[in-house]
């Protein structure tokens, strides 16, 4: 169970149909598509809140999580156990939309060409990775300080990706 979001999960019922039916049969374990749709909707809401824009959120079955500045892609399995860190991912990617300059890397790359710094593909990827790391910490810090209610989601994200928990 998610530590920071379990207070608003409804683990007893997942649909209006459940509310209308009064049978005593236990619900079979399995993928709850209604709950999954609710989780995706909630994650999309987090992106829209932190970015301040109506940003579409995509949920491929696998892959990386990222933003191109116009949409957010969350490439993680979503369930109640990992929901907190997935919300952390969504907040992180949404914060890039709100606070990142998506032209900055290209501008920095062009400046390095002016200085006659020979950029091989390897150096360019290293350079891009370093800029991304710094930018990630910067935008996370902005949201972390400005919205203390999201701290738990960020802690879950960092524990998953950086602290080995």
Model-assigned labels for residue ranges:
Residues 1-165:
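Basic/hydrophobic alpha-helical interface regions
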């Amino acid at each position: 169970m998610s530590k920071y979001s379990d207070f608003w999960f409804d683990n007893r019922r997942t649909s209006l149909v459940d509310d209308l039916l009064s049978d005593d049969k236990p619900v079979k374990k399995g993928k709850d598509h209604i709950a999954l749709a609710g989780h995706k909707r909630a994650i999309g809401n987090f992106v829209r809140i932190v970015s301040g824009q109506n940003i579409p959120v995509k949920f491929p079955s696998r892959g990386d999580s990222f933003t191109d500045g116009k949409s957010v892609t969350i490439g993680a399995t979503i369930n109640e156990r990992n929901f907190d860190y997935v919300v952390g991912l969504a907040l992180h990617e949404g914060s890039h939309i709100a606070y990142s300059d998506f032209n900055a890397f290209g501008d920095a790359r062009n400046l390095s060409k002016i200085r006659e710094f020979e950029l091989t593909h390897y150096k360019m990827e290293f350079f891009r990775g370093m800029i991304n790391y710094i930018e990630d910490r910067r935008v996370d810090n902005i949201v972390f300080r400005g919205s203390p209610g999201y701290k738990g989601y960020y802690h879950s994200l960092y524990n998953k990706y950086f602290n080995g928990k």
